[in-house]
Regions:
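Short N-terminal edge-element motif at the start of the domain
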Residues: 48-148
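Non-catalytic macromolecular-recognition regions in eukaryotic signaling proteins
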Residues: 70-75, 80, 161-164, 180, ...
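Intrinsically disordered, low-structural-confidence terminal and linker regions
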Residues: 27-42
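Short helix-loop boundary/capping segments
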Residues: 145-222
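Long, compositionally biased interface segments
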Residues: 29-32, 212-280
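Bacterial N-terminal signal peptides that target proteins for export
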Residues: 2-11
Length: 280
């Protein structure tokens, strides 16, 4: 293994350790003064950061990397979700507030303001440790170029033989409703299914607009415009919200190979153009 590969592996191990706690929040908050800039400035030398307003194509970050292959040509390695949308778009632009430590922040779907009483009816029992009807969630289907099986955290996207993979995140924002006619999360989850030799979700959301694809990073509240994520990720974010039956994601939270049972916090929206890659 070369010296560069050793550095990459050490970096990925550090990020993986944090991911197992907060899932895709990445980061080891490096205290190296060269990496963490003074308050008010931005971190430098990194590729474009995520999340972003996908309706804006503007970005001046000069770091370029090759986009990951289509999800169908990669292995699904993790599924997790965040309370409120990390990204912003016209369809999910209602600001949830500043929150604390990544919780009670982010963006909500516009359709969440026009739900019926039946859709807002409380489900029986606890859902994923606190989800309620009317809530917005952003689901991430994480894919890797490594030959691995799905499992908990970013560690499942790596292996000893594949320490620097291509990563792709397919993304959908949902409004939770108590309606069996809404989308069933079981239809979008993973159940040991493979297609053409690749681990795949049963399906990915359709009919929610053409996904916006761009170069970005891992997300989550451990990162900010002063503390950048070092991992390079190809993002594919659908621009429209969809209604999801809250009972079905509640069932998924009870048992899944990813050991996910709750919503994760969000990273503050990245707005400085120097930290954003241009969207083609």
């Amino acid at each position: 293994m070369t010296k560069i590969q050793n550095v990459k592996l050490a970096l990925l191990i550090a990020v993986t350790a944090s991911f197992l706690v907060t899932s895709m929040t990445g980061g080891a908050q490096n205290e190296d003064k060269n990496m963490v800039m003074e308050a008010g400035s931005i971190c430098e030398g990194y590729a474009g950061q995520t999340p972003r307003d996908i309706d804006s194509k503007t970005g001046t970050n000069p770091v370029v990397f090759e986009l990951a292959p289509p999800a169908s040509d990669m292995n699904l390695c993790n599924i997790h979700f965040h309370k409120n949308a990390e990204h912003k778009a016209e369809a999910f632009s209602i600001y949830a507030g500043d929150g604390k430590d990544g919780y009670d922040s982010g963006y909500q779907c516009g359709i969440s303001e026009n739900l019926t009483a039946a859709e807002l009816a409380a489900p029986a029992g606890d859902i994923c440790k606190g989800l309620e009807t009317g809530d917005t969630i952003e689901v991430h289907w994480v894919h890797t170029s490594c030959d691995v099986a799905p499992g908990p955290g970013l560690g499942s996207c790596l292996s000893d033989a594949c320490a620097n993979p291509d990563l792709r995140v397919e993304t959908q924002v949902f409004t939770l409703v108590n309606d069996s006619n809404a989308l069933d999360f079981n239809d979008l989850s993973y159940s040991n299914n493979q297609v053409n030799g690749f681990h795949q979700a049963k399906a990915l959301p359709e009919n929610t607009g053409l996904p916006v694809e761009f170069m970005g990073s891992t997300t989550g509240p451990s990162y900010s415009e002063q503390i950048c994520s070092p991992l390079q990720v190809t993002w594919s974010v659908r621009p429209q919200c969809a209604k999801l039956d809250i009972n079905t994601i509640g069932k998924w939270c009870e048992s899944n190979v990813f050991e996910e049972d709750h919503a994760h916090g969000v990273r503050a929206l990245v707005t400085d153009e120097r930290l954003l890659s241009p969207i083609e």
